[in-house]
Amino acid sequence: RGLGDVYKRQVHSVTVGDNAYVSLFKDLNVEQTSTQNSLVFAKESFLFTYGGNIYVLESMNARLYKYRVENGLLIQEKETMILPSGSLPAFLTFDSEEKAYISCVGLGKLYIINPTTMQKTGEIDLSEYAIGKESGDKNPEPGASVIRDGILYVGLAQDKSQFNPNTGAYVLLIDTKTDKPIKMISDNRATMATAYEYSGDPFIDEKGDLYIYCVGGFGYFANCTEGFLRIKKGETDFDQSYYFPIETISIPDIKGNKANYIYSKTYTGNGKLYGYFNVPGYVSNPPDYVNDKSMQTFEIDVYNKTVKKMNFDGTTGWSCSQCKAGDYMVFGMASTQGTGYYLYNYKEDKYEPLKIKTEGNPFKIQYLK
């Protein structure tokens, strides 16, 4: 299958300064993308797709936008949904054309919306599940989520302060028929279930097993361990026989032979994911998140608990987007080889470095099926 005859539509965002520019490009054969016909949002804006529509969740400005594709452009549908100031909406999970859930990290609530009409239909207060509620912390910081068998699984960061979580992994289970919480489950082997925003998990494999990655406080705290946890199909508790950390693995071909957490990742099937590892050996002192090329692409096998470095150079934390498009993984990077999209055919193990140059730093990308 050629790159041009199957993969017709990509929606992506690039960042320039404090803005994110969202636009479409035709396929993986375009040589260059431009911000000329882009929609402009605040920098931390996240892309979601459902039913042929594109949703832009503008986190810092607390707004949700809905678009359709028409003649190669993004045309807004319905009115912009304005959420409370400081709500920091970071994730959107679709149950149906009539129901979706927004994780409001800043509020400690889930908003229930109708994604067709773009109207709020309800909310779920999560304050009673906050670890620090006795001392006045009523926000468990809901992050990424997934629906399996009528249950919404929501990762809770359980922060003491920003990026400083209580130890342990916490996930809240909610009945999607009644929107009532069922229970909160926890596991002390790893910390901080999901990374606030969408980073490729939780995900469900072909067996129906649910995997969730705990980011461990982004490597800042020695007592906050990272790693994958699993909730098997038919179960609603963590599988005590499964835990897969990557920070304990000695990895050849990287400085210091160690990575301390996984950032964004994409599941492609058969237990395989592709994602970015943060490599402390490439972090300057003090850290420079804009320029340090500490994010390195890896293949991850959650079944066999192995990792393999890919043949791409490192990129920065603000330029590590990715998506699956057919048999290709598309990586948006600002590496030493240039800024843009790099391709990897995971079925044939073939690399195409800097296939598409971008105007701006790649931030998020989605493939429109």
Model-derived regions: residue spans:
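Short, small-residue-biased leader/transition segments that mark boundaries at the very start
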Residues: 2-7
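Post-signal peptide N-terminal segment of secreted/secretory-pathway proteins
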Residues: 19-112
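Short glycine/acidic-enriched loop and turn motifs that connect beta-strands
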Residues: 15-18, 61-63, 106-109, 159-163, ...
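Beta-propeller blade signature
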Residues: 112-115, 166-179, 224-236, 290-303, ...
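Repeated scaffold domains used in trafficking and secretory/extracellular systems
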Residues: 39-51, 84-93, 135-144, 192-201, ...
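Loop/turn-rich, solvent-exposed surfaces of beta-rich toroidal or solenoidal domains
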Residues: 258-333
